[in-house]
C-alpha cells in the first residue's frame, strides 16, 4: 500500500471517530434533556392528579345529590351538604335541613321530582370550588285535572367547600333555561290559565305553573339563561372562588 492510500485510510478513520463522538455526545445530551423533561412531567402529573381527584370527588357529590334525593334516601342525602348548606329552587329557598324535610314530606305525599345530569364544568381554587352541571328537572303533576310531565332544562350552579378530605355543598342555585309541559295521555289537553302562565319567567314558566297549581309558592326572580340575575350569580361565584364571603 502506498503512502497516499495509507494517508487516506487514516483520514477516514479520524473522520469516522469524530462523527461517532459527535453522535454519542448528541445522544447523551438528548438523554439528559429527556430525563429533565420526564422529571418535570412527573411533577406536573402529580399536580394534575390532585386537581383531577378534587374534580372527581366533587362530581361524585353532584351525582349522589340526584341519586339520593330522587330515591328518597334522606340520611345519605344529608351527607352531600355542609351543616350550613342552603338550597334555592322555584318552590323552596332555605337551609339544607329544611329542604330535606320539605322534600321528604312531598315524597311521602306522592310528589315526584326527578333529576337527570349532563356534563360538569368544575373550577377549583384551594378549598373552594364552583361546579356547573347541565341537568333536567322532570316533575309529574296534575295540571288543571290532567296528569302532565313538566321538563325543565338548565344547570346546577354549586358553591363547594372542602373541609378535611370532604367536598360538600354550601349552596345550590339552579339556572333555569327552558321548559315544556306534556300531557301523559296525548289525547288529554289541559286548559291552561293563560294569564297566570304568562306571569312566570320564560325559563321555568310551565314548571312554575304546574307547581303553583299544586299549592307551591313560586320565586319569580330565579336565574335564567341570560339576564341580570344570572350575571349576579356569576359575579358571586367569582367572588367565592377568590376567597370572598358567600353573598347569597
Protein language model annotation of sequence segments:
Residues 54-70:
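Short, aromatic-enriched amphipathic alpha-helices that serve as compact interaction elements
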Residues 17-19, 35, 40:
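Short hydrophobic alpha-helical segments enriched in small aliphatic residues
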Residues 42-59, 166-248:
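Terminal "cap-and-tail" regions of soluble proteins that handle hydrophobic small molecules
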Residues 128-164, 178-198:
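Exposed beta-sheet edge and beta->alpha loop/turn motif
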